């Protein structure tokens, strides 16, 4: 795995948990699902993302020099690509609903829907358009 990249599938608990969920998890109850994506992390940027299937609909394709980001896939599947711009090392994986990805500064990233997908992106750093450099995969 690339340095500065972490991918984790949040654990799923069916019914009320015996102990509090403090490190992320999905609790499925008759009334619906509760997903604790982060606990104790500061978020100064939060965005909802919808990914539609189709040629040329890849999102991202850029790198940030200063900003770390997290992406939580609510539902669907994405082909994710990352590249360490300093070393040239690359990685590709398929993300699915319940996956949580942390991307460090200096890692280019791109996401393409394999099926209709919804996700939430968050960061401790506000969005700065001057910290977005296009990257061609």
Regions found by a protein language model. Name each.
Residues 1-45:
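A short, N-terminal "cap"/entry segment at the start of jelly-roll beta-barrel domains
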Residues 51, 65-84, 122:
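Short, conserved beta-strand element in jelly-roll/cupin
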Residues 52-56, 97-98, 104-106, 116:
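Tight coil/turn sites that cap or link beta-strands
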Residues 68-73, 93, 101, 110-111:
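His/acidic/aromatic-lined binding-pocket segments of jelly-roll/cupin-type domains
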Residues 77-79, 100, 118:
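Structural motif
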Residues 85-105:
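Short acidic-glycine-tyrosine-enriched beta hairpin
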